[in-house]
Amino acid sequence: MSTRPSVMVVDDEKELANLYGLFLERSGFNSVSFTDPLSALDHYSQNHDKYSVVIMDWKMPNLDGIQFAKKIREYNTTVKILLITAYSTDKSFKEEVYREARISDVIEKPFKFKDVGPRITELCVSKVQ
């Protein structure tokens, strides 16, 4: 049995989902990547106790990252959710949306992958909010 934290990645851009997964594996995490949020949600509903962190994009078809986060919370209220976004809008609006969806952390694009690993590690070891 692995003691490495498991991370689920959801991004509708296949190349990015694969890149995140590869980076996570090289950084010491187990990862599973999805490009369809509905498939990811179905998987998560059956495996919600296996993941320490869920990383997702905000802009996705069928179910955006905020809607996805709210659905995830129906299965697990303590999993850490990291939202990756290039979505630009009023800061107070974003903060309210993040709070409502119980987003644990946000990384805004563009970002450097070397900065993501420590943020995920911090989420994995931080106490439940």
Predicted regions and their residues:
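Charged docking surfaces used in two-component/phosphorelay signaling
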Residues: 18-26
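Active-site residues of response regulator receiver
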Residues: 57
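Acidic, metal-coordinating helix/loop segments flanking the phosphotransfer/catalytic sites
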Residues: 33-53
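Hydrophobic/aromatic residues positioned on beta-strands within the core alpha/beta folds
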Residues: 84-86
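Short amphipathic alpha-helix used as the core "switch/output" element in two-component signaling
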Residues: 42, 66-77
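C-terminal output helix
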Residues: 111-120, 124
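Alpha4 helix (beta4-alpha4-beta5 surface) of REC/receiver domains from two-component response regulators
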Residues: 67, 88-105, 118
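Receiver (REC) domain active-site loop signature in two-component systems and cognate sites
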Residues: 60
